[in-house]
């Protein structure tokens, strides 16, 4: 995170902590004491839900609210997962070069291993959750579709999508500052004609494949709101960042 922050003239790192059964909080607190750029938010407004995406959306919104209140004048903000997906060496030149472009407002990246984040992905003809259609066919359809888009993307161009994350994304603040994350299935945010295209390819919508209460990837609502409210342009760079 600090290496990425060094690309900018000024930066802060905002992390939201809610609960754990290990020494995560101590590790984070020790780091705060060593780095004045680090903002640790202790989230006391936990959601009463067993759904993972509902909890993650709550934490991401907590970070977003802090940014809205204190750093809304920043030109960019980054949402980044803290797992092994972003643990590989980062290619800062890829980030720097893409920041010179003007054809995106929200940008994520390809990865060195097969593209994993299919749940956050909304493509032009496959806009809804890959886990809300019959399996295993739909998961493979989405996997094949994104790989086809990468293969056929002209050199130097970006892949246009409605939503994508893949562990890391950078946003132009003024286009996403008033959006928010939602881990619920927000079919009301998807235009009917796009939903019909999706169903023609994958069949009718089914209950959430992994069982339990219904949920959807929180990134989809975040991106769709910005697209339809602020004309945001969401894209994926075929280049590998991590």
Where are the model-predicted features located?
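Short glycine/serine/threonine-enriched helix-capping/active-site loop
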Residues: 43, 107-110, 237
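Conserved catalytic core of nucleotide-sugar-dependent glycosyltransferases
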Residues: 84-203
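A conserved acidic beta->alpha catalytic loop
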Residues: 3, 16-27, 45-48
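Conserved donor nucleotide-binding strand/loop of the catalytic core
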Residues: 29-58, 62-65, 69
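Short beta-strand-to-loop acidic/aromatic patch adjacent to the donor-nucleotide binding site
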Residues: 65, 71-87
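Short, acidic, metal-binding catalytic loop of nucleotide-sugar glycosyltransferases
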Residues: 1-10
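Active-site donor/metal-binding and catalytic loop motifs
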Residues: 174, 198-213, 229-242
């Amino acid at each position: 995170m600090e290496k990425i922050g060094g690309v900018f003239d000024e930066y802060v790192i905002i992390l939201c902590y809610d609960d754990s059964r290990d020494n995560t909080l101590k590790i984070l607190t020790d780091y705060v004491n060593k780095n004045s750029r680090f903002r640790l938010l202790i989230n006391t407004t936990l959601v009463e839900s067993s759904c993972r995406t509902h909890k993650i959306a709550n934490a991401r919104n907590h970070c977003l609210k802090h940014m809205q209140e204190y750093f809304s004048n920043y030109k960019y903000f980054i949402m980044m997962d803290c797992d092994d997906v972003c643990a590989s060496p980062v290619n800062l030149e890829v980030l720097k070069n893409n920041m010179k472009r003007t054809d995106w407002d929200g940008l994520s990246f390809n990865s060195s291993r097969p593209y994993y984040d299919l749940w956050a992905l909304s493509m032009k003809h496959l806009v809804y959750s890959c886990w809300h259609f019959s399996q295993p066919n739909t998961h493979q359809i989405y996997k094949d579709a994104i790989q086809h888009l990468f293969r056929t993307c002209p050199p130097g161009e970006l892949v246009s999508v409605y939503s994508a994350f893949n562990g890391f994304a950078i946003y132009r603040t003024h286009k996403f500052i008033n959006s928010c994350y939602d881990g619920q299935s927000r079919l009301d945010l998807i235009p009917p004609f796009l939903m019909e295209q999706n169903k023609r390819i994958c069949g009718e919508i089914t209950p959430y494949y992994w069982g339990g209460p219904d949920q959807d990837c929180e990134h989809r609502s975040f991106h769709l709101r910005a697209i339809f409210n602020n004309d945001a342009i969401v894209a994926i760079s075929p280049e590998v960042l991590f």
